[in-house]
Regions:
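C-terminal non-catalytic regions of proteins with extracellular/luminal or membrane-system context
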Residues: 1-48, 57, 116-117, 217, ...
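Surface-exposed loop and adjacent secondary-structure segments within mature catalytic domains
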Residues: 26-30, 34, 155-307, 312-317, ...
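Structural recognition of the beta-strand scaffold that forms the well-ordered cores
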Residues: 88-94, 130-135, 162-167, 171-173, ...
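Mid-to-C-terminal alpha-helical segments outside catalytic/metal-binding sites
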Residues: 428-448
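Short acidic, glycine-rich surface-loop motifs adjacent to enzyme active sites
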Residues: 122-140, 232, 312-339, 520-549
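N-terminal hydrophobic targeting/anchoring segments and the immediately downstream early-domain regions
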Residues: 7-196, 205-206, 216, 221-224, ...
Length: 551
């Protein structure tokens, strides 16, 4: 028995020592990363030629074409690409989440509280990544300050490649992760399904222009929307993010939405749109979403695959900067049943060749590897149809399918190994990096990536923006029927009418009618209904994506 206790004690002691050593190494590593970053935080020099000032991003004392705002777009791209090493090129092809402190501070170490587990400095300076998406953010002023600090860090790297920040929608009323990344100080607008209810293209353009201004005020330059999916399956959890089931209406409003955010063409006053989810999310088997393995199948019993492509024609006409394929498997539509981003017939043949799209293709988030803590998987990988492949094999298959960037992961080492082994040619990497750099240049990030912190508070939540959002909310309400009672239409309600309410603010209704707790005594009842759904808890995301049978 003593030997058993000795063995247990030795095992525990060894484990403790290993953990302690790992902790020390971890601390030293990130201390060094932070030290290097803080040491580098002085501004790069500037150059003056013919009365114009330029940023000397590579600090070589001369004006390179990529630093010259007067050079052609293609000349700038090719010059920068020629100066980039393979690590810098590979870094462009990842688009992971990034953490931000509660007060807008840069996170020097991995921080679970920021819904992220890696150091900001590590991502920028070691992994050479320059595209990030945000989840929860602090108040706009703190966010703008954080964004400027982030760009300052990026400026100090060898070539000074600026950061591009992206976001899911932040202007709706739904406040849960994965649907609306709400910021309480942005103006509030209807969800896309509400805009669709108005059928108003000009209103949709106006929303895009206002949302674009508020995004840019805090440094968000890529919108991970609109959703050009069709709501052909009523059990699907994401209908609120679509423009409904009418493909023609969806195409028209998708184009208007993108025009509002981007303008006629990408420029310094644009927010680039990443339209999703090619070739159309929505036809989900049993209504189950493709975030989950049981919802991986997209089915077309009416042979309507092509119908789901129609909204994307609007996106192409509006020159959407990027396209995001969905997780789903288009069952029986191509020669292999694999997720869209792994499917060459979907990306290269259909999107690139048939539809002539040459913009950025970025995968949906987490198709290569899931997210977890200490081996506990919180969110599984959406590697539908290729689960049997290793991570490097998945990366290779997606790149061969035609994607340019991977959302949600930061597996730079794995891609570097594929290039160094010859499994993926550097020429193929260059093809994607060109597309990614083109958007950065078009947005003006190489010339001035910073925001005016003094104006952030004047723009975000501006009174006229809020008022226009409220008017849009009113306009999107659809009256289905107005019965006549005693020769008088039921609506508008009479001032003294007795009203019974459920799931609606009694205080708000009491301004217009008398609220009663008795349904029997009420003249009218106003109920806010929720679509029936099946509670599930197999995955973290299931906690906020309500889906399933409508019984």
């Amino acid at each position: 028995m003593k030997k058993v206790f000795k063995f247990i004690a030795w095992t525990l002691g060894t484990l403790l020592a290993v953990l302690l050593l790992a902790f020390v190494v971890f601390q030293l590593y990130f201390m060094e990363i932070n030290r290097q970053a803080k040491k580098a935080l002085k501004e790069k020099p500037t150059l003056t030629e013919n009365g114009h000032t330029f940023r000397d991003l590579n600090a070589n004392g001369k004006l390179d074409p990529y630093e010259d705002s007067h050079a052609t777009l293609e000349a700038r791209i090719e010059d920068l690409l020629s100066q980039m090493n393979i690590e810098e090129k590979v870094g462009q092809m990842w688009h992971p989440p990034i953490g931000i402190g509660a007060e807008g501070e840069i996170l020097g170490k991995p921080d679970p509280g920021a819904i992220f587990f890696n150091s900001t400095y590590h991502l920028l300076l070691h992994k050479k990544i320059s595209h990030f998406n945000l989840f929860k953010i602090p108040n706009p002023a703190a966010h703008a300050a954080w964004y400027n600090k982030l760009q300052k860090i990026a400026e100090q790297d060898r070539l000074g490649i600026p950061v591009t920040i992206s976001s899911d929608p932040r202007h709706g009323a739904l406040n849960f992760l994965g649907n609306d990344m709400l910021s309480s100080q942005f103006s509030k607008w209807p969800e896309p399904i509400g805009l669709a209810a108005t059928g108003d293209s000009l209103l949709t353009v106006e929303f895009g222009r206002i949302a674009s201004q508020e995004y840019r005020a805090v440094g968000i330059r890529t919108a991970l929307h609109p959703m050009a999916d069709l709501a052909t399956e009523p059990r699907w959890a994401r209908i609120n993010g679509t423009f409904g089931e009418d493909a023609g209406l969806s195409a028209r409003l998708t184009a208007a939405y993108i025009f509002g955010f981007q303008g006629d063409s990408l420029g310094s006053e644009s927010v680039a749109c990443m339209t999703k989810h090619w070739p159309g999310g929505g036809p989900q088997e049993k209504g189950d979403d493709a975030h989950f393995r049981y919802g991986m199948n997209q089915v077309y019993p009416g042979k309507n695959f092509d119908y789901h492509l129609i909204p994307f024609e609007g996106a192409f006409k509006a020159h959407t900067a990027a396209i995001m394929p969905y997780y789903g498997v288009p069952v029986g539509q191509t020669s292999e049943d694999v997720g869209m981003s792994f499917n060459k017939e979907i990306i290269t043949d259909l999107l690139r060749k048939k539809h002539g799209y040459d913009g950025v293709v970025c995968t949906d988030w987490g198709i290569l590897k899931g997210f977890g803590i200490l081996g506990w998987e919180l969110v599984e990988a959406k590697d539908h149809g290729v689960r049997h492949l290793s991570v490097p094999e998945k990366i290779k298959k997606a790149i061969e399918a035609g994607v340019d960037q991977f959302g949600g992961n930061d597996l730079t080492d794995e891609l570097l190994q594929l290039v160094r082994s010859g499994a993926i040619g550097e020429q193929r990497i260059d093809e994607s990096v060109r597309r990614l750099l083109r958007v950065k240049f078009q947005l003006g990030l190489f010339d001035n990536p910073y925001v005016d912190e003094g104006k952030t508070g004047e723009i975000v939540g501006r009174a006229d923006f809020v008022e226009k959002g409220l008017l849009a909310q009113k306009k999107c309400i659809v009256l289905l029927k107005n019965d006549t009672l005693a020769s008088t239409p039921a609506l508008p309600l009479q001032r003294r009418a007795k009203v019974y309410v459920e799931n609606i603010s009694r205080e708000a209704v009491s301004k217009y009618a008398t609220v009663t707790d008795s349904l029997a005594d009420a003249d009218f009842a106003i109920l806010r209904l929720q679509t029936p759904w099946e509670p599930r808890n197999g995955d973290f995301i299931e906690s906020f994506l309500n889906q399933g049978y409508l019984d």
